[in-house]
Design a protein with these regions (language model features):
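Glycine-/small-residue-enriched transmembrane alpha-helix faces in small-molecule transporters
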Residues: 1-39, 48-49, 87, 91, ...
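Juxtamembrane helix-entry segments on the extracytoplasmic side of multipass membrane proteins
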Residues: 3-7, 29-38, 74-78, 136, ...
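Helix-helix packing/entry segments at the starts of transmembrane helices
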Residues: 15, 39, 109-115, 179-200, ...
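Juxtamembrane helix-loop-helix junctions in multi-pass membrane proteins
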Residues: 16-46, 65-70, 104-108, 174-198, ...
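Specific transmembrane alpha-helical segments of multi-pass solute transporters/efflux pumps
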Residues: 21, 55-112, 148, 229-247
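Transmembrane alpha-helical segments that form core, pore/gating elements
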Residues: 45-48, 119-122, 126, 139, ...
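C-terminal transmembrane-helix exit sites in multi-pass transporters
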Residues: 47-52, 116-137, 261-281
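Hydrophobic transmembrane alpha-helices of multi-pass small-molecule transport proteins
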Residues: 48, 131-151, 203, 257, ...
Length: 305
């Protein structure tokens, strides 16, 4: 199995976890957005601390060096990466949770948040990354698929929550590009730990500044906090960091937007929700876009010539 295939599978698993987390996030919309984010982020830190130790022990048993930064420069780079990725993730997650709190429609939230699938390659142009025609066609197919899947009744009027979710998509795009820049240079699990420590501190400060967090809230919403903290934050974002290595960030964003597909399929399989022909067509188009983006068309055409 090639590294690209393995990384793509990690990102698909990441998308699967994120897709099921939308329901949990919506269930937590009755809680303050920053308080909910603080709860899930501290839970992620608690999960990642022993995970780092476990990976170090595994590497030692295999005779490989662990991921600890060995020099002051490496430690500084890890802190810089964690601070940048964590700040972007905090801002993106806060915008998303605030948007969902104002309008708990998971369908529209899923569509608008997944617009990073277009924004990542667009922002990449400013960094000198020109995507192939194959990639841009895949992006267009993905947007059509997302619209068919998520927007059953059209947009309706633009709400303030929509602008927050679009801001979330912009910030997630920056976070994806930051992970793409830093992840090949350091241990991915450690980067995820520092990233979520930054998110935890930022969201805790914001919760005390703008909300009135109470222990009763954390008890009431313990289920959504635990699921989002352990699975969506602790596991899925670590898979994102590991999966983005050696993978074009535009292709990575395309794979991760499958969270909308997995959200719909999960509702159909587990909650027995109806999946219309329109929604099924959206799922098919999204999967087709991901496959098209990774087909070695250039190599195939050269071999035929």
């Amino acid at each position: 199995m090639t590294n690209q295939t393995k990384n793509s599978m990690l990102l698909m698993l990441c998308a699967l976890i994120w897709g099921t987390a939308f329901v949990a996030q919506s269930a937590g919309s009755g809680m303050g957005a920053f308080s909910f984010l603080a709860g899930r982020s501290w839970m992620a830190v608690l999960v990642l601390l022993p995970t780092v130790k476990a990976f170090d022990a595994l590497h030692h048993r295999q005779g490989r060096p662990d991921g600890k930064p060995k020099t002051a420069a490496e430690r500084k780079l890890l802190l810089k990466a964690g601070l940048m990725c964590g700040t972007l993730l905090f801002l993106a997650s806060a915008a998303q949770q605030l948007g969902i709190t104002l309008d708990p429609s998971t369908a529209k939230a899923g569509f608008l948040t997944a617009m990073y699938v277009v924004l990542v390659p667009v922002f990449g142009l400013f960094l000198g990354r020109k995507g192939s025609a194959q990639l841009w066609v895949s992006m267009a197919i993905a947007v059509v698929g997302l619209y068919l899947l998520c927007m059953k009744d059209g947009f309706g009027s633009i709400q303030s929550s929509d602008w927050l979710l679009l801001l979330c998509a912009v910030l997630f795009s920056f976070q994806i590009m930051a992970v793409d820049h830093f992840s090949p240079q350091m241990d991915g699990v450690r980067l995820s730990l520092v990233e979520f420590f930054v998110v935890s501190v930022d969201s805790t400060v914001a919760a005390f500044l703008f909300e009135q967090p109470a222990m009763a809230e954390f008890v009431t919403f313990a289920g959504p906090i635990l699921y989002c903290g352990i699975m969506s934050s602790g596991v899925a974002y670590t898979l994102q960091i590991l999966g983005q290595r050696d993978l074009n960030p535009a292709v990575a964003s395309l794979i991760m937007c499958l969270e909308s597909v997995f959200s719909a399929l999960g509702g159909w399989l587990l909650l027995h929700q109806n999946l219309s022909f329109r929604e099924s067509s959206g799922c098919v188009l999204l999967f087709a876009a991901v496959v098209l983006a990774q087909l070695p068309l250039g190599r195939l055409m050269r071999s035929k010539a």
